[in-house]
From Swiss-Prot:
The chain crosses the membrane at residues 401-421. InterPro entries: CWI-Assembly_Regulator (IPR051648), Rcpt_L-dom_sf (IPR036941). It is a lipid-anchor; GPI-anchor. This is Cell wall protein ecm33. Induction: Expression is under the control of atf1 and mbx1 via the putative cAMP-responsive element (CRE) sequence TTACAGTAA and the RLM1-binding sequence GTATATATAG in the promoter region. Residues 1-19 form the signal peptide. A lipid is attached at S398 (GPI-anchor amidated serine). Keywords: Cell membrane, Cell wall, Cell wall biogenesis/degradation, Glycoprotein, GPI-anchor, Lipoprotein, Membrane, Secreted, Signal, Transmembrane, Transmembrane helix. Its main location: membrane. The gene is ecm33.
Length: 421
């Protein structure tokens, strides 16, 4: 009897040693529930966890039991049949949490997950709901691309490097009420009626808002890079506390827009572009004094009111269809420093030529000649919003997995389109 008890003790100890070994010998490649079950005793998994169905096993449901922490990446990809994946105990992932190319997945349960190194959800065309029940409060990057989500629920961050929501055709609301600081924000190619709320956002590097119906960034004070609005159904854009934009500013193809309100904006380090047919007056910038690149204003406006503007380092292109327009600047004054000067009304078709290429604009402080004179590129302009099409990034997961790289391509295409029409 004593020997039997001793043998059982040894067996139990051996099992614990084996379990500990299983938990620290990653990476782990999983394609079946049985393989996952071998990790049930692991509370902490050391190494990357890869879950895929590349072998077309036909498995439809997987549950990752027991694991509370992964010291590495979690990558779930390329499953043709997997519809449901559950991490009932998972609380944190030190690396990336990536789920992509799962065309049938309609359930992704992560009820305890609060912290990841980065979050990437891409090409999940049947995923309708996020289940971050405990609240995802820590992630350096969030990329959500090509899903059927209607809202971004359960994500509450106060700072983030990249926040990208693209190609989600059913999404109606993107709300990040606690977000105060971000390096790169890209909202584009989603549902036409999407509403965006970043009510506490005070600092951003670059932000693109494309195809939105409502936006609240009323507390934004600093934009160190670019700030773009395009293809929107907004009737008003108001950013009352913003004082400086480090690089370029653009408002494009938003025909319902009737007013702009930037009462404290003094400086734009790069190009300044407005191409909209709904504005009857270019105003709302009462204290802007310096534009580090070119100034491009296209549309149906009858007046321009920028009373403090004294220094435009690049070229000027102003064209409007209004017949009662009077240009507030002349080629002889000292405001426009660039070589090209176009400022005219009664234009039947907005189609001018300029040597200024906004896509090459950089901050005036960089010392580049581009910011002062523009590049030697011939471009033309059009104020017809119908000529523009919304820039949509690829539905391939590679675009989303590259984070803001895809966003940069979208921004570039928008700017090139604005200047090439």
């Amino acid at each position: 009897m004593l020997f039997k008890s001793f043998a059982l003790t040894l067996l139990f100890a051996a099992a614990r040693v084996q379990a500990a070994s299983n938990c620290s010998s990653g990476p782990y490649n999983i394609s079946a529930q049985g393989t996952l079950d071998e990790l049930n005793s692991c509370t902490v998994l050391n190494g990357d966890l890869y879950i895929s169905d590349a072998g077309n096993s036909g498995i439809t449901t997987l549950t990752v039991n027991g694991i509370e922490s992964v010291q590495g990446d979690v990558v779930v990809s390329d499953g043709q049949y997997l519809t449901s994946l559950s991490f009932p105990s998972l609380k944190n992932v030190s690396g990336a949490f990536n789920v992509n190319n799962m065309i049938r997945m309609n359930n992704l349960a992560t009820p305890e997950l609060t912290s990841v190194g980065s979050l990437n959800l891409a090409v999940l065309p049947n995923l309708q709901e996020l289940q971050f029940n405990a609240g995802l409060s820590d992630s350096d990057s969030v990329v959500i691309d090509d899903t059927q989500l209607q809202a971004i629920d359960g994500i509450s961050l106060d700072s983030v490097t990249t926040f990208q929501v693209t190609n989600n055709r059913y999404i109606q609301e993107i709300t990040m009420e606690g977000l105060e600081s971000a390096q790169n924000i890209q909202i584009s190619a989603n549902s036409k009626g999407v509403s965006v709320n970043f009510s506490k956002l005070s600092n951003v590097t670059t932000a693109t808002f494309d195809g939105i119906s409502n936006v609240f960034i009323g507390n934004l004070k600093s934009a160190a890079g670019n700030l773009y609005f395009s293809n929107t159904t907004l009737d008003n854009i108001s950013v009352p506390y913003l004082t400086e934009i480090g690089q370029s500013f653009a408002v494009l193809y938003s025909p319902e827009l009737t007013s702009l309100n930037f009462p404290n904006l003094t400086t734009v380090g790069g190009g300044f572009v407005i191409n909209d047919t709904g504005l009857t007056s270019i105003d709302g910038f009462p204290v802007i004094s310096e534009i580090g690149g070119g100034l491009v204003l296209l549309g149906n406006f009858s007046s321009i009111d920028m009373p403090d503007l004294s220094d435009v380092k690049g070229a000027l292109t102003v064209e409007t269809k209004a017949t009662n327009f009077t240009c507030p600047w002349s080629n002889d004054d000292s405001v426009i420093k660039g070589d090209d000067f176009t400022c005219q009304g009664s234009v039947a078709t907005i189609s001018a030529t300029s040597s200024y290429d906004l896509s090459s604009t950089v901050s005036a402080t960089s010392g580049s000649a581009t910011s002062a004179t523009g590049s030697a590129t011939t471009t033309s302009y059009s104020s017809d919003s119908s000529a523009s099409s919304s820039s949509s990034s690829s539905h391939e997961s590679s675009a989303a997995s590259n984070g803001f790289t895809a966003g940069a391509l979208v921004l570039g295409s928008l700017l090139v389109a604005a200047l090439a029409m």
